[in-house]
Amino acid sequence: MQNITDSWFVQGMIKATSDAWLKGWDERNGGNLTLRLDETDIAPFAANFHEKPRYIALSQPMPLLANTPFIVTGSGKFFRNVQLDPAANLGVVKIDSDGAGYHILWGLTHDAVPTSELPAHFLSHCERIKATHGKDRVIMHCHATNLIALTYVLENNTALITRKLWEGSTECLVVFPDGVGILPWMVPGTDEIGQATAQEMQKHSLVLWPFHGVFGSGPTLDETFGLIDTAEKSAEVLVKIYSMGGMKQTITREELVALGKRFGVTPLASAVALY
């Protein structure tokens, strides 16, 4: 019999959560991660499912996600512990046929529940499914240190933060040409912040929560982790630049345009036109 803990999706979640903790992005129970699956991914492991799956209603119906399975991190769970006990810290859930709630098929033992940011994740999944024609499958939220730091010293403006991150490392424009959305500060774990995040996810694969963290979306766990890692590396460079007195020279507008042409991407127009 196949064991679900050996599946590609459980092993992928173990690696992503462990790597994020080692990066320092997910202290204590900070951060959350969800991966949209297909029925064919989970079907071979039906023997591992709970005999009586718990049902939890969603705070608002999400018919676009009807009958869709996900693997999710748990509420109050520490990323550093996922590798030690996947079944206690992760869960496979499946949305019901009308999108009103979900059953916990596997994991989240001892009456654990999915992350408190599940509304933000599911709403963002809906928008990224539409924006990428189903290509994006991962939503990752973490407390990337230097990205958070920048929200204290830069104007919280999409065009400005995007432009500065592009300048912080040449690869950034290629990796996230659609730029970085940013919200006003909001109380986490609410439908309101979930809706605001999803609205930005219509246009951007990265969304900053000022003084809190970042949301990233991508087609795979590796791509999504790499997206956040790239932005965070640029933010680290910028933090060092500002601590050394600021930029003396940088990548110019003309050079950014040339970079986009070379790699066949269309940079966010408002960030290119900023100066």
From Swiss-Prot:
Q: Could you tell me what this protein does? A: Catalyzes the reversible cleavage of L-rhamnulose-1-phosphate to dihydroxyacetone phosphate (DHAP) and L-lactaldehyde.
Reading the lineage from the top rank, the first entry is Bacteria
UniProt organism field? Salmonella schwarzengrund (strain CVM19633)
Look up the EC number in the record and give it. Answer: 4.1.2.19
Q: Which reaction does it catalyse?
A: L-rhamnulose 1-phosphate = (S)-lactaldehyde + dihydroxyacetone phosphate
On assembly, the entry states: Homotetramer.
Q: Which GO terms describe its molecular function?
A: metal ion binding; rhamnulose-1-phosphate aldolase activity
Provide an example Pfam family for this protein.
Answer: Aldolase_II
Question: Which keywords belong to this entry?
Answer: Cytoplasm, Lyase, Metal-binding, Rhamnose metabolism, Zinc
Q: Where in the cell is it found?
A: Cytoplasm
What pathway does the annotation place this protein in? Carbohydrate degradation; L-rhamnose degradation; glycerone phosphate from L-rhamnose: step 3/3
A GO biological-process term: rhamnose catabolic process
**Binding, Zn(2+):** 141, 143, 212
What name appears for this protein in its UniProt entry? Rhamnulose-1-phosphate aldolase
| Note on how the cofactor is bound | Binds 1 zinc ion per subunit.
Name of the coding gene: rhaD
Q: What is its main location?
A: cytoplasm
The protein's required cofactor(s) are namely:
Zn(2+)
Cellular component aspect of the GO annotation: cytosol
Q: Which residues form the signal peptide?
A: none
Q: Which residues form the active site?
A: 117
Q: Which family does it belong to?
A: Belongs to the aldolase class II family. RhaD subfamily.
* Record flagged with keyword Ligase: no
**Principal EC category:** lyase
Tell me the InterPro entries matching this sequence: Aldolase_class_II_sugar_metab (IPR050197), Aldolase_II/adducin_N (IPR001303), Aldolase_II/adducin_N_sf (IPR036409), Rhamnulose-1-P_Aldolase (IPR013447)
